[in-house]
Amino acid sequence: MNLRIAMAIALGGAFGAVARFYISGLLPVYRDFPVGTLMVNSIASLILGYLYGLLFWGFDVPPDWRAFFGTGFCGALSTFSTFSYETFSLLREREYLIATLNILANVIITIALVFAGFMLARR
């Protein structure tokens, strides 16, 4: 890895972390459901799917931009650890239905958005 790629990842990560902070802060919890975490994971999945689609469909995306958006921005924007912690907290509070919905929503929605982003890049 060269310095340019490392700096692209660091800069993308900084923007992604700040975006996660603000988005999660705007939509923290709705009736015990962690909407903010679902939203940041969804946005990151859509962007990552779009980036992957661009590469798959033959668009030339420079390596530093792939690093900035893919590893940096999307990596810092999405948050598997917070998703896991919030799900564990819901289970600990015996909110079994909400915990199950949280798991299903995060997995199904984010995979669907990766696919949607992938298909959007085809245009």
From Swiss-Prot:
Catalytic activity: fluoride(in) = fluoride(out)
Subcellular location: Cell membrane
GO molecular function: fluoride channel activity; fluoride transmembrane transporter activity; metal ion binding
Highest taxon, organism lineage: Archaea
Pfam families hit by this protein: CRCB
Membrane protein topology class: Multi-pass membrane protein
Main location: membrane
Binding site for Na(+): 75, 78
Spans through the membrane: 7-27, 39-59, 68-88, 101-121
GO CC annotation, single: plasma membrane
Keyword Cell membrane appears in the UniProt entry: yes
Keywords for the protein's UniProt record, in alphabetical order: Cell membrane, Ion channel, Ion transport, Membrane, Metal-binding, Sodium, Transmembrane, Transmembrane helix, Transport
Regulation of catalytic or functional activity: Na(+) is not transported, but it plays an essential structural role and its presence is essential for fluoride channel function.
GO BP annotations, alphabetical order: cellular detoxification of fluoride; fluoride transmembrane transport
Biological function: Fluoride-specific ion channel. Important for reducing fluoride concentration in the cell, thus reducing its toxicity.
Family: Belongs to the fluoride channel Fluc/FEX (TC 1.A.43) family.
PANTHER family attached to this UniProt entry: FLUORIDE EXPORT PROTEIN 1-RELATED
Protein name as it appears in the record: Fluoride-specific ion channel FluC
Gene name of the record: fluC
